[in-house]
Regions:
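A structural boundary/capping signal
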Residues: 1-119
């Protein structure tokens, strides 16, 4: 298994700092391109609420802001295993967040009120 260095994590943080809210696809692509160039294993995680329109098209992350982080029901991040922990890096988490916590923090209407999960 390839280990990721502190310097490489700092580079990922720099990449992420270039992306704003609603730019998760572009951010994930930039991180993925960097990981490939460094031969660091990672996995692109694509979430979908099941609806690109209507109230389920809005995804929120309560740890980020009160504004929606997605308007089309989709959000993406990159999973990197660091010290045997699945960490997610996206345009809102430059320091990374555990995959479990990331999935808990991301909300949409039917998840909040009806227990639906991402597809």
């Amino acid at each position: 298994m390839t280990q990721i260095t502190t310097q490489q994590i700092d580079t990922i943080k720099e990449i992420i700092s270039k992306y704003k809210n609603l730019e998760c696809v572009e951010c994930a692509q930039a991180i993925q391109d960097y990981l490939i160039s460094q031969k660091i294993p990672g996995k692109r995680i694509k979430l979908y609420t099941g609806s690109a329109i209507g109230r389920n098209s809005y995804i929120y992350d309560e740890t980020v802001s009160k504004n929606a982080i997605s308007l089309n029901g989709r959000h993406q991040g990159i999973e990197i295993i660091i010290d045997e922990v699945e960490m997610i890096f996206d345009n809102h988490h430059p320091d990374g967040i555990t995959k479990a916590q990331w999935l808990i923090n991301l909300l949409f209407y039917d998840k909040l009120y009806h227990g639906q999960q991402f597809q």
